[in-house]
Amino acid sequence: MCSPTNFLYEPFSSDAVTQNYDQNLKCTKCGAYYSMACSLREQNVWTCLFCNQSNSNAELPLVPSNTYTLTSAKKEILSRRTIMIIDAICDPHELNYLVSILCNNYITRQQEPLSIITIQQSGHVILHNAVNHRRDAVFSINEFMTKYNLDKLNASYFEKKISEINQESYWFDKSTQGSLRKLLREICKIANKVNISSKRDKRCTGLALFVSSVLASQCSLSAYCHIVSFLNGPCTKGGGKVMSRERGESMRQNHHFESKSSQLQLSKSPTKFYKKMLEKFANQSLIYEFFIASLDQIGILEMSPLITSSMAVSQFDSFNDERFAMSFQKYLNLRDHNAIYNCHSKIMTAKNAIVVKDFPKYSLNPKNLSLPLEISLGHNSAEAPIQFQTTFENQTEKYIRIETLLLPKANRSFGAQNEIVFSMKKIASRIIDSFAYSSKHTKELMKQLFLLPNQIRGKDVDMVNLIQWCYHIYRSPILSVRNTSPDERYLFLHRIINASKDTCLSLCKPFIWSYSDLKHDWIVLDVPLTRAQILQDDKTTICVDGGSYLVLRRGKLLEKEGRELCCKLLNDLQRFPQPLYVETKTGGSQDRFLKSKIIPLDITDKETLGTEDMTFNEYFNLFTDLSGSK
């Protein structure tokens, strides 16, 4: 039997020529649509690619295209609301900066209803009233009924308390912007400094997220609600708790997944809580997004049921960080101009196809969407047609996009990079979907990675190059926990799932930009990160783009030009979440960060870097031994 073809469908990756279609372009027998590959038997008569039915049409498309789009204008603009959860357990100076960003960037452009919820140090969660703050809805984790109903996810208890006052009074609009600014300033005034005590603060993140979901559920089913959380630490009380209040107890680490430790059990409980919470509001169009002012873990791994995209989480050292201001501005621009909702894609014509991971319904940046498919195409011809239908909407219109592609047969190769990206997405999906982060499960996936080169033998693929890419996957947080916390690894896996092909490759094997005197421009070098380029050369300035980070290694030459290139890459709207930016020089304090990203190719590299990692030579020998034993 012919092995399936691995394919990545990226419907929004480029601005391809599209045109509106009409029903005359639809096959009368199977329902497939006309494409450029359809043969013309005579004038205005075309043969369907999928069933060979002859179809007549008075006017065939004038613009040659395989992509057709049906656009329907909506009767009303997309109904959208926003709930902001502000963690007030924060340094006052930092909270002031967050509030100034919200006032200057969001409130000035506010077009939709906004609600404010704060997480207080005392274990209180406050839903603020837009008309009279004395009528705020206050929920305390210290009250038995609140904690009991939260654990039971009893929404009616919270609905009753919210509905004691007209629930619309909890929403700020353009007419109440003055009250909103006043409220935000008041939140800063009453926020206490970090509490120095024997226990951690009562931070009830789960309670705040549940209250916000209940409030959003009382709106129209057709309304989309963004629940945007600005967090400063992990949940320590109530549903969603990921860390003990005892300062001697730490959050779970990678090694806790190897045993039935108390930290691991504490990790599973909030995951179950958020999973049930998501199921409870499944009929609502709720979108959870997080801005986190802490590079430490706060429980993103446990919140995984709420996170549908890597773009839903942005993490910084603090809200004072310039990267936060830039990232939040990008977020607003993408949400207003690029985001799509209610996205679904299906294969109209291929029966033997398996979707590895569906598109998320909401995408902040659809150009990154990639649908990995395993398609059995058979043996008959050199090429096989396949047709996709993707439906989505933005703030003003609804779309149906039909796209026809010709796929090469399984005995022809897409190239090593396509196979690698597909494998990355497949492995990442399996880890996230099964919540399996133990080394035992990792070893099972490692075996699949070793088998990949053997599975595509006979194809036109550079096998050594393919094995090198497999080694990069082995060294990445997909399969390695080296220098990576559970939260960081989870976000990395989500980036892989939601990233375009090029971004996936940079996450796996960083791009190295260097200036070419021949081309008078910056180019990507096809060389590995080795000691020759990174650890010894102190003359040449290079830029290392690892997808989630950007490192400028300053040399004696072209330092200014290198910084300009980095600024250009950082300011690209499509780079979201905002990459971490690091500048270093030979022997500089940030050299350790860059060295942690370097793979040891041989024993000399291993000794220079002081790492226990398997070198590429060792990996290649292991692969050769395993292949020879089969």
Curated annotation (Swiss-Prot):
Q: What else is known?
A: Present with 450 molecules/cell in log phase SD medium.
Protein name as catalogued: GTPase-activating protein NEL1
Q: Name one GO biological process term.
A: COPII-coated vesicle cargo loading
Q: Which family does it belong to?
A: Belongs to the SEC23/SEC24 family. SEC23 subfamily.
Q: Which gene codes for it?
A: NEL1
Main localization, broad class: cytoplasm
Record function comment = Acts as a GTPase-activating protein (GAP) for SAR1. Contrary to its SEC23 homolog, NEL1 does not associate with SEC24 and its homologs, nor does it associate with the COPII components, suggesting that it is unlikely that NEL1 functions as a structural component of the vesicle coat machinery. May function as a signaling molecule.
- Assigned GO CC terms: COPII vesicle coat; cytosol; endoplasmic reticulum exit site; nucleus
Whether Cytoplasm counts among this entry's keywords is yes
The record's annotation in Pfam families points to: Sec23_trunk
Question: Which UniProt keywords are given for this protein, alphabetically ordered?
Answer: Cytoplasm, GTPase activation, Nucleus
One of the entry's Gene Ontology molecular-function terms is: zinc ion binding
Is the keyword Transmembrane assigned to this protein?
no
Q: What happens when the gene is disrupted?
A: Leads to a significant growth defect in the temperature-sensitive SAR1-D32G mutant background.
